[in-house]
């Protein structure tokens, strides 16, 4: 999905490289097939990951290539609202269409040899038994089962310290989500203080222009995605408006870094300047403001210069 991830999040890189961030950035990736998103790798050795996929063939390559098993953890299991085994259908020709059998039976799935039993666990269970500790952020790409994951995470969401969720979702209605997936997902997250901050869009073009619209750039044409907005990738954040003296400096730094990671440098900069007295105990606030107006390695633009543009 097309979030505006900066090519070089200078603030995030610098607080990690200089040792200004005093604790890990803790991430859950639900649907980690193919590896964690490259934008998270800017946290470097500060990144601690719990990655989940229901199939061993997705997890085994990640485990085999894992050079940081102490902080990068991969699990062959799905997440949901129950601790159980459930049939899972994998489509090798189109992995994003793979899915669990619906728990309420509304999909009328015909379970045959193409399905396999996989383990589901609630986040509350994994949090209670210590498999997962404190968490800052969770990314979910679970092919419409994100609502069930949230419903199985009541204690986790209340006690883990998580302040951000990225989730694939959609507005069309189905028998399993009659009011739409987004409505049901937001109804679970909103009472916990999460608000919408960003959205990426995946478009579904009609067959007549499936390759995209030919946009002239210079002397050649570039194909620009077109089509109805079909699937979305929403960013939900909480606590950004209720920061107080109880919010640790490390948490402030991670909140600013996540805002930058999603191209919300204005949000990060406002937090930095609002809480400059506390943050100045850890870093040079003016220099940090400079980092937040840079997204490339070849610019030396400062915040003061930005204000004069």
Regions found by a protein language model. Name each.
Residues 15-19, 124-131, 155:
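Short amphipathic alpha-helix with an adjacent loop that forms part of the alpha/beta core around
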Residues 5-95, 101-113, 171-174:
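SAM cofactor-binding core of SAM-dependent methyltransferases
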Residues 25-26, 40-51, 129-266, 275, ...:
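Conserved acidic-Pro-Pro-aromatic motif
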Residues 75-79, 117-120, 139:
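Conserved residues in the N-terminal Rossmann fold of short-chain dehydrogenase/reductase
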Residues 248-309:
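C-terminal accessory extensions appended to soluble enzyme cores
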Residues 96-98, 103-109, 118-130:
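Switch- and interface-adjacent substructures of P-loop NTPase systems
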Residues 1-3:
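S-adenosyl-L-methionine
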Residues 110-116, 225-229:
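A recurrent flexible, glycine/aromatic-enriched loop bordering the glycosyltransferase active site
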């Amino acid at each position: 999905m097309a979030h505006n991830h900066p090519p070089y999040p200078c603030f995030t890189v610098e607080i990690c490289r200089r040792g200004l961030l005093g604790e890990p950035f803790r991430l859950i990736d639900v649907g980690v097939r193919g590896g964690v998103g490259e934008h998270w790798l800017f946290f470097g050795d500060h990144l601690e990951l719990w990655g989940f996929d229901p199939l061993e063939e997705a997890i085994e390559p990640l485990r085999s290539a894992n050079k940081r098993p102490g902080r990068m953890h991969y699990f062959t299991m799905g997440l949901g609202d129950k601790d159980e085994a459930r049939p899972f259908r994998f489509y090798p020709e189109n992995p994003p269409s793979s899915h669990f059998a619906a728990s309420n039976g509304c999909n009328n799935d015909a379970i045959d040899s193409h399905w396999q039993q996989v383990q589901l666990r609630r986040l509350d269970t994994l949090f209670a038994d210590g498999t997962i500790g404190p968490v800052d952020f969770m990314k979910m790409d679970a092919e419409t089962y994100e609502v069930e994951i949230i419903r199985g995470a009541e204690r986790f969401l209340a006690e883990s310290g998580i302040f951000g969720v990225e989730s694939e979702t959609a507005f069309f209605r189905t028998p399993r989500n009659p009011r739409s997936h987004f409505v049901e997902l937001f109804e679970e997250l909103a009472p916990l203080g999460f608000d919408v901050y960003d959205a990426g869009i995946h478009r579904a073009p009609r067959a007549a222009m499936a390759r995209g619209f030919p946009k002239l750039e210079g002397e050649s044409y570039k194909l620009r995605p077109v089509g109805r907005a079909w699937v979305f990738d929403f960013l939900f954040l909480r606590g950004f408006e209720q920061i107080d003296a109880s919010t640790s400096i490390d948490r402030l730094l991670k909140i600013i870094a996540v805002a930058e990671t999603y191209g919300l440098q204005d949000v990060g900069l406002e937090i930095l300047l609002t809480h400059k007295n506390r943050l100045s105990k850890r870093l040079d606030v003016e220099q940090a403001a400079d980092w937040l107006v840079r997204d490339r390695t070849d610019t030396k633009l400062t915040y003061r210069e930005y204000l004069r543009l």
